[in-house]
Amino acid sequence: MQEERSEKKIGPFKFQSNFEWKEFPQEEFEWFVKEVEKRFGLNLSSYKPQRVKRRTELLLRKYNVGYREYLNMLIKDKKYLDEFMDKMTINVTEFFRNPEKWWELRDEIIPLIAKNSLRMKFWSAGCSSGEEPYSLAILVHELNLSYKTRILATDIDIGVLRRAQEGIYEERAFVSTPKEYLEKYFEKLPDGRYRIKDSVKKIVEFKRHDLLKDPFEKNFDLIVCRNVVIYFEPEAKNELYRKFAESLKPGGFLFVGNTERIFNYKELGFEIYKPFIYRKVK
């Protein structure tokens, strides 16, 4: 039983300052997951359940509320919904993460695509705050191929997409970025942050997209989806890889994170082109 001893008010909501914390029954968590999908379209059941439960209950502890009270907060105030979406999705990234793999794209894979394509179509799936698609765009500029390239960048989280479109980053996002790229493609702001130049931004199109629910575009030459799929349940992972394969042109490439492997890649019509880079052969 929860005892209400005193309350504090934040915005329109009252929070119990002496909330008696308890472990919530599993059925309350499952109810919450279903309500979130029904009301907001976020399918949490395809994520690893312990990760979702842990992150949600950290927010419940923060506000000293239960699942039902918290759902009411999400419905009535977009600020809490944005915070929840940010906690549930994966938004930790940097420019040129695992740089040796990006140099393989620059030196071999993108030139190979360009040789065989009049127009190049790339997709950064689960793009977070934009570091990944902008990394791609920088490589395209370095190869003087921006005139024939379109980069689609998608994420489920509207908040991070807004940050991506703004294109302003803290210095810590550039730990793997060559100095010449930083000087050539970014403008340093008075507060020490960096803003991506418009010449890079203009070939990237940002769009909200739910990998688990929304239809996929077709005929991509390259799909980059790194450190996103690891958070999904095995069934959802397999379905995503199948849909990525269907979205690629024959000969197209799928670039995944350095902790991700597609064990049934042959069944999906892939070959291992390089470690963590798969090529569609069917």
UniProtKB/Swiss-Prot annotation:
**Annotated Gene3D superfamilies:** Chemotaxis receptor methyltransferase CheR, N-terminal domain (1.10.155.10), Vaccinia Virus protein VP39 (3.40.50.150)
Top-level enzyme category: transferase
Q: Does this entry carry the keyword Iron-sulfur? A: no
Q: Name the Gene Ontology molecular function terms of this record.
A: protein methyltransferase activity; protein-glutamate O-methyltransferase activity
Q: Reaction catalysed? A: L-glutamyl-[protein] + S-adenosyl-L-methionine = [protein]-L-glutamate 5-O-methyl ester + S-adenosyl-L-homocysteine
Which InterPro entries does the UniProt record give?
A: Bact_Chemotaxis_MeTrfase (IPR050903), CheR_C (IPR022642), CheR_MeTrfase (IPR000780), CheR_N (IPR022641), CheR_N_sf (IPR036804), SAM-dependent_MTases_sf (IPR029063)
Q: What Gene Ontology biological process does one annotation of this record name?
A: chemotaxis
Can you give the residue ranges of the CheR-type methyltransferase domain?
A: 17-282
Instruction: List the SMART domains.
Output: MeTrc
CDD domains documented for this protein: AdoMet_MTases
One Pfam family cited in the UniProt record for this chain: CheR
> PANTHER family per the record?
CHEMOTAXIS PROTEIN METHYLTRANSFERASE (PTHR24422:SF19)
Role noted for this protein: Methylation of the membrane-bound methyl-accepting chemotaxis proteins (MCP) to form gamma-glutamyl methyl ester residues in MCP.
Protein name in the entry: Chemotaxis protein methyltransferase
